[in-house]
Amino acid sequence: MEVYCLFMMRKKEKVITMTVTLILVVILICIKVTHFVIIERPLKQCRIVSAYHLTVNTNGAQIDQSWLFEKDDLTYIDIAKTFEQTYFVTDYAGGSSDSGALNELTIAFGETMDGMPDIRITVSENGYIQINGKRAYPLSLKYAGKRLYVHLLGCLQDGADLQQ
């Protein structure tokens, strides 16, 4: 009888351990899926619909490139969710390691009566995003700035490859 009780207790401990392990695995899978759906997937979407003016200045040579992004392409920038206008790139200042300048990409949202953008988001390669505009409080925040910067530059590069 004692042996049977010990056997049953060990079996019960194994069942509890397996249940706890299974619950932890399910939680980890849910976290990974949520991370992929909310963060990773939007970063991989990149559709360029039509051109706007963008000047890239590289060592004195100016290259005109410009692209209009569809609204859904940039909705993973939190503040962008409140705007219904199309987004367009207004400026890209390319820096080099020699000059110490930072690469910067500015995106404008909508346009006011005086031709100024409602909101400007500047993404720097140091990982900072600066947001300015009449309808937003100016702020600077450390975000997934590097990833966003690389993604947007990838969009521009994809567009340039498509045009050639």
Residues covered by each model-derived region:
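N-terminal Lys/Arg-rich, disordered targeting/topogenic segments
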Residues: 1-13
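Function-determining sites in protein domains
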Residues: 10-164
